Structures are given as structure tokens and as C-alpha cells.
A protein has these predicted regions:
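Short helical (or helix-break) motifs at transmembrane helix termini and adjacent helical loops
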Residues: 2, 6, 35-36, 57-83, ...
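Transmembrane alpha-helix boundary signature
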Residues: 2-18, 36-55
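Entry/N-cap segments of selected transmembrane alpha helices
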Residues: 14-37, 108-117, 206-231, 255-262, ...
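Interfacial helix-loop-helix junctions of multi-pass membrane proteins
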Residues: 42-54, 97-106, 271-291
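Structural signature of hydrophobic alpha-helical transmembrane segments
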Residues: 48-63, 86, 104-117, 153-160, ...
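Functional cores that coordinate and move charged inorganic groups
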Residues: 69, 73-166
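Predominantly late transmembrane helices and immediately cytosolic-facing juxtamembrane segments
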Residues: 98, 126-128, 132-142, 146-149, ...
Length: 314
């Protein structure tokens, strides 16, 4: 839901409101999802069960990636921070769509029809300029329940509800319903919900895991997908977009800083763990997922920080 609020704000007023500025993170995010998935799939190609985890290294954790970049303060240009935020938001939307379409089963047409009717009602509320938040939350809760019962992952309902919430307030310059909700919910999500989820899922027990299993195809594919695939996909696609004139280089940023930011895109953590939880249910595979996610995310955070810390803004 909060990701949906962030997406709408950025599209209407933020970094994604300008076509050329928006093109760069969109194209970079695409590369940052495709290349890690390809690396994971190439390593696990001969194992149908392991292939279920192809989307695990395709995710970026907004809070952790932006948090590491924030530690650098004025050593990185503001435009680069906006680029990473937009990239992570688009990446999260891609992850949500992947979850909805590839990790859902047993679709119920009647439940989907009711969810579609609820989404239409949300659109009607928006078109009618209803500025109170509770009607959106009430209808959104019903849509969430219908989507959950339909067999499609319910994260999609949160995004749909958020996109319907009005951005502007009653008076010009007044905080609108969307920004009010985002300001209230973001601290809870960033400092309570995400840390609880991370701590609950990040505990890696190596009991029963041999040294060979720690570097087996599943954790190896995830770690390499995050640490190698993410920066390779993000930076390469960003360079193509800039060279072709489709996208614009973040103001004040150097090529090295762009690459360092691409490395930070490999911090998958919470979203990668979440996809891993949906892909695998066995204790052995779950432990391997955690090893791969933590290894890839930690290497991305440390190396990305060091690359950016050693280079100043141009």
C-alpha cells in the first residue's frame, strides 16, 4: 500500500513526472530485474524446484538501499538519491506484479470479478473527488479480501487502493489525503513493520547445512544475482538509455557514482526474503534462500558504499 502511495506521488509530482527523468530509472529497473533472474536461472537450470526462486534476486529493498546512500550525506548529489528512490519504487512494483502473476495459484473468477468491481468503485470515489480517507480504506480492505480469496497475491490490492487515493487537498498548497497517509504510515513501515519482518526472517540457522550446501545453486544463484546481476543490469541499461538520449544522467553525478548506486540496487533483503518465502516452503530451501539473500545484500551494501565514499560529486 505504501509503495503504491510513493509510486503515485512520484508519477504526479516527483521524479517520474518528467518523461526523460523518469525513463532512466524505469529502463534501469527493467535491466535490474531481468539480468539477476537470468543469472539465477542459468545456475539452477537443471532443477525445476530450484527454478521457482528465479525472481528472488530481482528485488531491491527501498528502505535499506536508500538508507545506505543516506549515510554518505552530501558526498552524493541529490539527483542520484532521487534516481535510486525511483529505481527502487519501480523495482518494488515489478516485484509485486511478479508475485501476483507467478506466485499465485487456484484462481477464483468470481472473487476476481468482485475485486474488479471494488477497484472500479475506488476509481469512482477518486473521480467524484472524495477527499476523506476512510472510504478508500474501507473499499480497499474489501478489495484486498477479494484478491486474497481469488488466489492472486493480495499485495496487488494494496497498490490498486493506493493509486486511487487523491493527491491534492481541499485548498491549494494544503496536504492532500495521499501525502497525509504516506507521512503517517511510512515511519511505521520503515521502522516497525520492515524491521520486524527482517528480524523474523533473517535468522540463518546453518544446522543441517554442509559447506557444499551453503554454496549450492540456490544460494549461489541468489547471491550472484544480487551482487553481480543487479549492478550489471541497472548500469548497462542506464548507460544505453543515456547514450541514446532516452534518459538523462542524474545532475552532478559521475559514471562511477552511477555504478556505485547500481551496486546498492543489489540490496534485496526484505523483498527478496518475501519472494523466497513464497517460492520455497521446505526448511532446507528456506535456509539456503536466507544465506543467499544476506550474502548478496551485504556484499552489495558494503561494496556500493565503498565505491561511492571514495568518489566525490562532479
Amino acid at each position: 500500500f505504501v509503495v503504491g502511495l510513493e509510486i503515485k506521488r512520484e508519477v504526479v509530482r516527483g521524479a517520474l513526472s518528467n518523461r526523460k527523468t523518469a525513463s532512466l530509472p524505469v529502463i534501469a529497473a527493467f535491466g535490474g530485474m531481468v539480468v539477476p533472474a537470468m543469472i539465477y536461472a542459468s545456475i539452477n537450470w537443471d532443477n525445476d524446484i530450484a527454478l521457482r526462486g528465479w525472481a528472488i534476486p530481482a528485488a531491491t529493498d527501498i528502505a535499506f538501499a536508500v538508507g545506505v546512500l543516506a549515510l554518505l550525506g552530501s558526498r552524493v548529489p541529490p539527483a542520484l538519491k532521487v534516481f535510486l528512490l525511483a529505481l527502487a519504487i519501480i523495482d518494488d512494483l515489478g516485484a509485486i506484479l511478479i508475485i501476483a502473476f507467478f506466485y499465485s495459484s487456484g484462481l477464483s473468477v468470481s472473487a476476481l470479478a468482485l475485486a474488479a468491481a471494488g477497484i472500479a468503485l475506488l476509481a469512482l470515489l477518486n473521480r467524484s473527488n472524495v477527499l476523506r480517507v476512510w472510504p478508500y480504506l474501507l473499499v480497499g480492505a474489501i478489495v484486498w479480501l477479494c484478491v486474497l480469496k481469488s488466489g492472486v497475491h493480495a499485495t496487488l490490492a494494496g497498490v490498486a487502493t493506493a493509486l486511487a487515493v487523491p493527491l491534492t487537498g481541499v485548498k491549494k498548497g494544503q496536504e492532500g489525503p495521499l501525502e497525509s497517509l504516506e507521512n503517517r504510515l511510512s515511519p511505521w513501515v520503515s521502522f516497525v513493520i520492515l524491521p520486524i519482518f527482517a528480524f523474523a526472517n533473517a535468522g540463518v540457522s546453518l544446522t543441517g547445512l554442509s559447506a557444499a550446501q551453503v554454496v549450492s545453486p540456490i544460494p549461489l544463484g541468489i547471491a550472484l544475482g544480487l551482487f553481480i546481476g543487479k549492478p550489471l543490469g541497472i548500469y548497462t541499461c542506464a548507460r544505453v538509455a543515456i547514450s541514446s538520449g532516452i534518459g538523462a544522467m542524474p545532475a552532478g553525478a559521475s559514471q562511477v557514482q552511477l555504478f556505485g548506486t547500481a551496486i546498492l540496487g543489489g540490496i534485496g533483503f526484505t523483498m527478496s526474503l518475501f519472494i523466497g518465502m513464497l517460492a520455497f516452503h521446505g526448511p532446507l530451501e528456506s535456509a539456503e534462500v536466507r544465506v543467499g539473500v544476506l550474502a548478496g545484500s551485504l556484499m552489495s551494501a558494503v561494496v556500493g558504499y565503498l565505491v561511492l565514499a571514495r568518489h566525490r560529486t562532479v
